[in-house]
Amino acid sequence: MLYSRSVAKINGVSARQILDSRGRPTVEAVVSLSDGALGVVSVPSGASVGKNEALELRDKDMNKYGGHGVTKAVENVNSIIAPRLVNTDPFNQKALDDLLIELDGTDNKSRLGANATLAVSVATAKAAAASLKLPLYRYIGGVASREMPVPLVNVINGGLHADNGLDFQEFMIMPIGASTFSDALRMCAEVFLSLKEILKSNKLSTNTGDEGGFAPNLESNDRVFCILLEAIEKAGYKPSIDFALALDVAASTFYDGKIYKFSGSSMSSAEMVSYYEELVKKYPIISIEDGIAEDDLAGWKELTVRLGKKVQLVGDDLFVTNPRLIKDFSERGLANAVLIKPNQIGTLSETIEAIRLASMSNFNSIVSHRSGDTEDPFIAHIAVALNCGQIKTGSMSRSERMAKYNELLRIEEDLCGTAILRSVKIGRH
């Protein structure tokens, strides 16, 4: 992303505190250029957080927003970042992000806050794209950007994302039989609606969790899988052919350092892997995210050895979108796919580098939202720009989730028939 022929410079950088989908404050940044181009970006926030994520700076003033305010991060943009960026080149993203990293001066963005640096980083890219009259995905990725992502749609919420008895955080459907993104989205919406009818007919709650999926009180994971298969068939589709299932276990949330405790059971790492093997035999599950806790590296190794050729094993808390960790753990044979959350690392350039390193290791990359999100659709552009092939951005409800899906529909239309939707490859390829 180096467009040297433009003469526009950054002439304004500012930030404000707005609210995310959970009613908690987050950062919105505004970057303006000398030619009148403008970039406005707001950043998300997670509930299930990896311990190695870049720091999301919060005020910790318990008298306001329960300590979740971000006025310090906003002030860092307005008083520290803005003066250094005014009159600089907005088209050299790497140089701009390197400056943000230098201004912060820490390993985890703890001085300025990753919420501050990411907002400014992506807002600058958005302003630069506007200056060149390009969509953001085209500005970031160039002419080769045309692969639409297969959506992993979260239809049942559990864990930290819902107030029900399910320990696993997300139960997702993947429209593996779709030929276009618009078809994929339609198929998912139809299954989502049929699932709602099934839950109602069983007198189960159709209230939704943080990410828009239903949050019924179900007695077991097996019950969830059976209901999902019923919903797929009720919508007129075939499990394993039209749809597969995916999980976000978020195993770190029920791991005590030695044992996994969930659903009234206690399991070792080896027993967890055996449990997943049984699930994969019984149900069309092709993707498991954070099936092992981030600190249980031996467990990750065993999971990868035993299931890595059959199932997409996604590291979220394990990698936290950190290029160094992706390189290290991929070389050690842990996982076979990386979840990409830009706010875990704090700049657009580092996000791009994380995806590049994943690709070099023959890992899939899945671009992801966070449970506390905004209506900003920039991750949709990142997914297409870098031909990631998969996106995880919630369910078929809540407008902050639908904003990403609707933006992908616009991008597919903008590609004028050149867009492709590839099948999901499993394992290192």
Swiss-Prot record:
Q: Which GO terms describe its biological process?
A: glycolytic process
Cofactors (names): Mg(2+)
Per UniProt, where does (2R)-2-phosphoglycerate bind?
A: Q169, K341, R370, S371, K392
**SMART domains from the entry?**
Enolase_C, Enolase_N
Q: What GO molecular functions are on record for this protein?
A: magnesium ion binding; phosphopyruvate hydratase activity
Q: Where in the cell is it found?
A: Cytoplasm; Secreted; Cell surface
Q: Where does Mg(2+) bind?
A: D248, E289, D316
Question: Which E.C. number(s) belong to this protein?
Answer: 4.2.1.11
One Pfam match, given by its short name, reads: Enolase_N
Q: Does the keyword Metal-binding apply?
A: yes
The UniProt entry's GO CC annotations, sorted and at most eight, read: cell surface; extracellular region; phosphopyruvate hydratase complex
InterPro entries noted in UniProt:
Enolase (IPR000941), Enolase-like_C_sf (IPR036849), Enolase-like_N (IPR029017), Enolase_C (IPR020810), Enolase_CS (IPR020809), Enolase_N (IPR020811)
User: How is the co-factor bound, per the entry?
Assistant: Binds a second Mg(2+) ion via substrate during catalysis.
Active site per the UniProt annotation: E211, K341
**Hey, which family's this protein in?**
Belongs to the enolase family.
Functionally, this protein is described as follows: Catalyzes the reversible conversion of 2-phosphoglycerate (2-PG) into phosphoenolpyruvate (PEP). It is essential for the degradation of carbohydrates via glycolysis.
UniProt-listed PANTHER family: ENOLASE (PTHR11902:SF1)
Entry protein name: Enolase
- State the species of origin: Anaplasma phagocytophilum (strain HZ)
Query: What is this protein's gene name?
Result: eno
